[in-house]
Regions:
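N-terminal glycine-rich phosphate-binding loop for ADP-containing cofactors
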Residues: 1-300
Length: 300
C-alpha cells in the first residue's frame, strides 16, 4: 500500500514469494487487479523457469504483461492459480519430505541420496534441504500451520516434521549456511554426510531397495501434481511437465510428472499408487481424477 502511491495506474506489483497466497498479499492493495506472483528459482542466473501466479483479482492484462516480461528476460513462464505453495513448491516438497520420512523410518542416508541420483534427480533430497536451510523449511511450515488455524483446518504432524524438529532443537544443525545439516562442509574438499545421523535416527533392520525408494520419489510428486491439476491449481499439462523439470529437477528422462504417469500407463500407475498407499499412507492414495482416467481409458 505504501509503495503503490509512487506507481502509475498501469504499474504491476509482483511478489517473489514461493509459498504465501498472492490473494492474501493483494487484499490491502488499492489495485488488486495489478497484483501478481512472479516466482523465480534459485540460483536465478541458472534456473530458466518463472512460475506466474494469478490471484483472484489479477487481470488478464496484468497476466499478459507478466508473461511478456518473463520472455523478455529469457525465462520460461508457466501460469498457475493461487493456492498455498502454488504448484512448484507444493510438489517439490513431496521430494524433500519423502527423503525426511525415509530418514525417520530408519533408512540409511547414503542409500536415500544414491537412490535419488540414480532416479535422475540432480541432487539428493537431504542435500537439497541443506541448501534451502532447515530453519527456512521450519518457518514455511509455521506459516502453513497459521493458515490452517485461520481456515479452521486441523494441522497434522508428519514424520518429516519430527525430523526437522530434531535437527533444529536437538542438534542445532540447520544446513549449509549454519553449522552443517545432514552434510558436513569442510573448508577444503567435498561435502560428506554427517557421521552422527544414525545416532539421532537409528537404522532400521528393514532397508528398502533402491527401486522402492525411487518409486516413492517419482510417485509422491506425480500424485501431488495430479491433485494440483484436479484442484485447478495448474490447468496445463505441458506447464505441469515443464515446471517439474525446469523448476526443481524432476528427471528430464521422464518428460515431466504427468508425462511420467502417461508413459507408466494409467491403470498400472493407479495399481502401484494403491500398493504404496497401503504400505506408506494416504499421501500415495490415488486421486479421483486418476480413477476417472483409468476407467475411461484417457490420459493427461
Amino acid at each position: 500500500v505504501e509503495a503503490e502511491k509512487y506507481l502509475n495506474k498501469e504499474s504491476i506489483f509482483a511478489s517473489n514469494t514461493s509459498t504465501i497466497p498472492i490473494t492474501s498479499l493483494a487484499k490491502n492493495s488499492h489495485k488488486p487487479n495489478n497484483f501478481i506472483g512472479i516466482h523465480f528459482f534459485s540460483p536465478v542466473h541458472r534456473m530458466k523457469l518463472i512460475e506466474i501466479i494469478k490471484a483472484k483479482k489479477t487481470s488478464s492484462m496484468t497476466l499478459l504483461k507478466t508473461i511478456k516480461y518473463a520472455k523478455k528476460i529469457k525465462k520460461t513462464p508457466i501460469v498457475v492459480n493461487d493456492s498455498p505453495g502454488f504448484y512448484t513448491t507444493r510438489v517439490f516438497e513431496r521430494y524433500t519430505n519423502e527423503g525426511l520420512t525415509m530418514i525417520y523410518e530408519g533408512q540409511k542416508a547414503k542409500s536415500i541420496e544414491k537412490s535419488a541420483i540414480r532416479a535422475g534427480y540432480p541432487v539428493g533430497p537431504l542435500a537439497v534441504i541443506d541448501e534451502i536451510n532447515i530453519n527456512l523449511i521450519a518457518n514455511i511450515r509455521k506459516h502453513k500451520y497459521l493458515e490452517n488455524e485461520k481456515n479452521n483446518n486441523k494441522t497434522k504432524i508428519f514424520s518429516s516434521d519430527k525430523v526437522i524438529d530434531i535437527m533444529i532443537k536437538k542438534v542445532n544443525r540447520t544446513g549449509r549456511s549454519g553449522l552443517g545439516g545432514f552434510y558436513e562442509y569442510p573448508n577444503q574438499g567435498k561435502k560428506f554426510l554427517w557421521t552422527n545421523i544414525e545416532k539421532y535416527f537409528p537404522i532400521s533392520k528393514k532397508q528398502l531397495s533402491k527401486i522402492e525408494m525411487m518409486d516413492r520419489f517419482y510417485f509422491s510428486q506425480a500424485i501431488e501434481t495430479i491433485r494440483c491439476y484436479e484442484e485447478g491449481v495448474i490447468e496445463s499439462v505441458s506447464d505441469a511437465n515443464i515446471g517439474s523439470i525446469l523448476g526443481w529437477g524432476f528427471p528430464s528422462s521422464k518428460g515431466g510428472t504427468l508425462k511420467f504417469v502417461n508413459d507408466y500407463g494409467i491403470p498400472k500407475f493407479m495399481a502401484r499408487t494403491q500398493k504404496l498407499a497401503d504400505k506408506y499412507g494416504n499421501r500415495f492414495a490415488p486421486p479421483r481424477l486418476l480413477q476417472k482416467l483409468s476407467e475411461s481409458g484417457k490420459i493427461f
